[in-house]
Amino acid sequence: MKKTFVCYYHIIKELLKVIFNQKKYYHNYITCGEKSIQIRKDLEKCGIKFRIEIAPEIYGLEIPAVIIANHMSTLETLLLQGIFPENVKCDYILKKELINYPIFGKVLSVLQPIAITRKNPRLDFEIILKEAKNLFEQNISLIVFPQGTRYNIISPEQFTTIGVKLAKHYNVPVIPVALVTDAMGQGKLIKDFGKFDVTKEVCFAIDKPFYVVNQKEAMNHIVSFITKKVKEWGRTDLLSNCE
């Protein structure tokens, strides 16, 4: 419990800095990325170990992309912008209710996230197409969690094609991301914020970009990459029917 308190102390401390100095962070993906890096450093001080693997091709990327990752906890929403190098500025497609959260929601709103309800898939996709165009024109990439919600057990049928459809529509590349972030658990009262287990390693792997030709093949490639990395990290306990 003490470790959890200290972890949240550091997270909230950094998020409040964003709220009280919004002019510095408003639509500024560099400073928000730096804040994300600071949160990671603070969590390292709490005892959490990180493993980060980035394909060399990412460092030379000069165009926007659709970043497709599995979804395990709120931790990736806090950290992913600081995992990518500065040349890849990115924002999120996320559930609308997150914007209404105290502190966390205000921080997310500093940038330009695309908020959807997940109640009407067709309407959600229309919103995404409209708002994504504006972000891509600013060379801002979009992070998509196609599972729709957090899962501790990864299974292929959880993944929707929303990310690959978006990438194909605008002819931008896809960047697969595998992650394990169950060091931050799910809460009993508020699902998004649970206890920390500092004995669990937090892992991120960013694959090289590719263009979508066939949506099914693209999804198979993404899920295969995620599965492979989770196995390499010794976390087969998180996999279900992903052979």
Predicted regions and their residues:
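Cofactor-binding loop segments of dinucleotide-utilizing enzymes, especially the Rossmann-like FAD-
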Residues: 70, 95, 147, 179-180
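Membrane-anchoring hydrophobic helices of lipid-metabolizing enzymes
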Residues: 1-66, 78-79
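Residue-level preference for the first positions of well-ordered beta-strands
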Residues: 64-66, 139-145
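Catalytic core of membrane glycerolipid acyltransferases/transacylases, capturing the structured
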Residues: 7-10, 14-22, 61-120
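A cross-family acyltransferase "interaction/gating" segment
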Residues: 105, 141, 153-217
